[in-house]
């Protein structure tokens, strides 16, 4: 967690103190463009929202090899925390493979294929299958996966992910909608819908 101006020590402070069983770890630096969302709204609940979204036009989400090594040590080795490795593109899968080869991560690896964030791989069935094929090649049988397809693509690609052998993840963090134009009332509503589908 944490903000983009925080050091790795600041970003990991809560995890080091609370020692969670699992936390996410992004497998590389990337552009993380949320700014197109600012063009879709005229009214804001909070004054900071448009500036924050527009600020992502000139923002790099930083996770260097050194950052990742530090987090693997400080939260993983020293704290006993397992990781959900977030991969926003195929290069991130290769980065995870690098850490696996070096023995800095141990199977089973929990991989989250993240699709649909501007700056990462697009949200499509073809891209999800490409991510899966790449992970099969690079990680072999050392991993389990789930899918996060930001926004309107979530249920469709989570369903495909399940068909491909992945675990299922749904919730308001990933999509605010239960159907086209219809806001979800709760996480439970999304869980019930994916249970009906699968």
Task: List each model region and its residues.
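Mid-to-C-terminal alpha-helical segments outside catalytic/metal-binding sites
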Residues: 192-198
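N-terminal active-site wall of soluble small-molecule enzyme domains
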Residues: 1-19, 122, 128-134
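A short acidic, helix-capping loop that chelates divalent metal ions and anchors anionic groups
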Residues: 176-181
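Catalytic alpha/beta core domains of metabolic enzymes, predominantly
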Residues: 22-172, 184-189
């Amino acid at each position: 967690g944490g903000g983009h101006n925080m050091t790795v020590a600041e970003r990991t402070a809560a995890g080091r103190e609370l020692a969670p069983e699992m936390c996410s770890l992004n497998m590389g630096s990337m552009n993380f463009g949320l700014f197109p969302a600012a063009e879709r709204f005229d009214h804001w609940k909070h004054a900071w929202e448009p500036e924050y979204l527009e600020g992502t036009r000139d923002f790099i989400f930083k996770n260097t090899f050194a950052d990742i090594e530090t987090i693997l040590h400080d939260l993983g080795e020293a704290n006993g925390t397992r990781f959900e490795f977030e991969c926003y593109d195929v290069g991130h899968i290769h980065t995870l493979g690098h850490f696996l080869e070096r023995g800095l991560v141990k199977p089973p690896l929990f991989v989250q294929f993240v699709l649909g964030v501007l700056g990462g791989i697009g949200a499509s069935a073809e891209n999800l299958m490409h991510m899966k094929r790449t992970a099969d090649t690079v990680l072999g049988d050392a991993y389990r996966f789930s899918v996060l397809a930001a926004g309107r693509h979530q249920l469709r690609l989570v369903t495909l992910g399940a068909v491909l052998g992945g675990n299922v993840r749904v919730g308001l963090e990933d999509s605010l909608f239960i159907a086209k134009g219809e806001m979800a009332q709760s996480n439970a509503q999304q869980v019930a819908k994916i249970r009906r589908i699968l």
